[in-house]
Amino acid sequence: MTLQDEIKQLAKEARDASRTLAQVSTTVKNDLLKGMADALVAATTALMAENAKDLEAGREKGLSDAMLDRLRLDEARIQGMADGLREVAELPDPVGEVTGMWRRPNGIQVGRMRIPLGVIGIIYESRPNVTADAAGLCLKSGNAVVLRGGSEAIHSNRAIAGVLKGVLAALGLPAGALQLVGTTDRAAVTELLKQEDYIDLIIPRGGEGLIRFVSENSRIPVIKHYKGVCHSFVDADADFDMAEKICVNAKVQRPGVCNAMETLLIHKDAAEVFVPRIARVLGELGVELRGCAETCRLAPGTTPAVDSDWGAEYLDLILAVKVVDGLDAAIAHIQQYSSLHTEVIVTRNYPNSQRFLREINSSVVMVNASSRFSDGNQFGLGAEIGISTTKLHSFGPMGLEDLTTRKFIVFGEGQVRE
């Protein structure tokens, strides 16, 4: 069988399975997710063994420490995948929900009911936990899912998908409901993007190159999980202890994820005190600073920033730092360089916080909190499918409702149109 035929068959099986999934009861779907969670925990040793193969290959390829961290599975992360599935099982099922009914003058009643999208294709890189997270959300929302992970995580993804498919089979549900493209051949992505007869939506998660390739080559609608150029702005009257804590957490806790801070903006009236302070703290934690001229003056040893630094998603212990004239300048900078992911203001000035919330147009805007909270699980959505930076049809962390659409339902008593 050619690669083209293989991908087409895989997508067709997912489409066939989606018709069954759309009718599966909430109880069965919840049992499925809980069973998958138990199965992942039971397979921890085997999953870590397969993940070790990917980590070794990654080291041989020279992947950065941050990228290896994204790739790594340990007991805690496998437990986290299982916990995420259990949390999704506890969430309300959106399928079948009627969102409003109204009566027309002729007596007919019109409403809208949530239904699954059908088949969702997820194309992602590095993080093998996406395999379980995406499967859980898609299946709970009544959708079949076709997964294509990065070649660097192929052993981990195959192992996770195998565990999850085993639970589908045990409950008598169609195996085609969860499909993994098992080849590392990049041509498989191109073929997947041609399956408009069988796949309803593509969600790419990864670097800028992947997102651009998918957007330019897909025949299927795409929701972009674009790069996370997340900004934090420290206002003139910010609590500096709070600002330090937020900035350190946003940059250092997990620098290789999309909700890590990549650019720090500091009000000029706070700069004399805060720039040396945060530079010292971050430097001790191994962060390389790339700053404007004023930052370099206040924090000797800072690397002078170039234009490309302001729009960079480093995914590493590197931070762009700029001193700005005030809130107007901070907002203008963010509007120019933002990827519409997450932006933060640290301030004790209520009017400034409200203006920041109104004028910043990113999918998540925060006041006095770390950008690391920009996550579906942290928002109570359960494990997320991604953080959409596309305003249609979803914006921000995507949960169950974002994997459904609505159809109109009409009740009559024999009315005909005059």
Curated annotation (Swiss-Prot):
EC number: 1.2.1.41
A GO CC term assigned to this protein in UniProt: cytoplasm
Protein name: Gamma-glutamyl phosphate reductase
InterPro entries: Ald_DH/histidinol_DH, Ald_DH_C, Ald_DH_N, Aldehyde_DH_dom, G-glutamylP_reductase_CS, Glu-5-SA_DH, GPR_dom
Pathway the protein takes part in: Amino-acid biosynthesis; L-proline biosynthesis; L-glutamate 5-semialdehyde from L-glutamate: step 2/2
One example of a Gene Ontology biological process annotation: L-proline biosynthetic process
Localization annotation: Cytoplasm
Enzyme kind, highest EC tier: oxidoreductase
CDD domains: ALDH_F18-19_ProA-GPR (cd07079)
Catalysed transformations (reactions): L-glutamate 5-semialdehyde + phosphate + NADP(+) = L-glutamyl 5-phosphate + NADPH + H(+)
Source domain of life: Bacteria
Organism lineage: Bacteria, Pseudomonadati, Thermodesulfobacteriota, Desulfuromonadia, Desulfuromonadales
Keyword Amino-acid biosynthesis: yes
PANTHER family cross-referenced by the UniProt entry: DELTA-1-PYRROLINE-5-CARBOXYLATE SYNTHASE, GLUTAMATE SEMIALDEHYDE DEHYDROGENASE
Family (UniProt): Belongs to the gamma-glutamyl phosphate reductase family.
HAMAP family per UniProt: ProA (MF_00412)
Keyword Kinase: no
Task of the protein: Catalyzes the NADPH-dependent reduction of L-glutamate 5-phosphate into L-glutamate 5-semialdehyde and phosphate. The product spontaneously undergoes cyclization to form 1-pyrroline-5-carboxylate.
